[in-house]
Amino acid sequence: MVVADEQTAGRGRQGKQFYSPRGTGIYMTVVVHHGRRLQDAVSVTTAAGVAVCRAIEELTDKHPQIKWVNDVYIDDKKICGILTEAVVGMESGLAEAMIIGIGANMQTEEFPPEVENAASLDADVSRADMIAAIADHLWEILDDGYESYIDYYRSHSMLLGKAITFIRDGVTTPATAIGIDEIGGLVVRLEDGSVITLRSGEITVRPRCTKKS
């Protein structure tokens, strides 16, 4: 595990910059060696999301929610992002290691204009204590397997039952989020009634705006 006090070139999903000012957030990277399939990356990301939420609930009176697949929100504001990348073996085709990046705003007071809908945890807890709690919960979850946390993940989802849109290969599609499968995939019902499961890390899920009459 590597922890930084600041990131000068923090990176989020799809190459976006991750704002990481000195001394105000948690910037940690965990490397997990396991030899899993690439599609299991989504389950590792969901495990990290649960670890962050459990740590927040353990150390504060906040009530976090998870926006599939990699963001943690409090009061509809993003306070944490998670990025998982794989190191793939050339011969095996397996993910020999998963690199889990966790960035959480602890006491960040100001955000640049391009950082939308962000907020800080703003709780009376040290970064060191929060990092230790996240790491403890993450190792416990990874040791115990999917069954130990998937119900928790579902109960903390901020999307289930809501109308959403997802973007895949540049195409925006309306759907309804109806479930989380056993390894963390988002199950959605399309407008034609068909049901699919989203797994790709390049999918962006946004609550669909509804017009007021």
Predicted regions and their residues:
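General beta-strand structural signal in soluble alpha/beta enzymes
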Residues: 4, 64-68
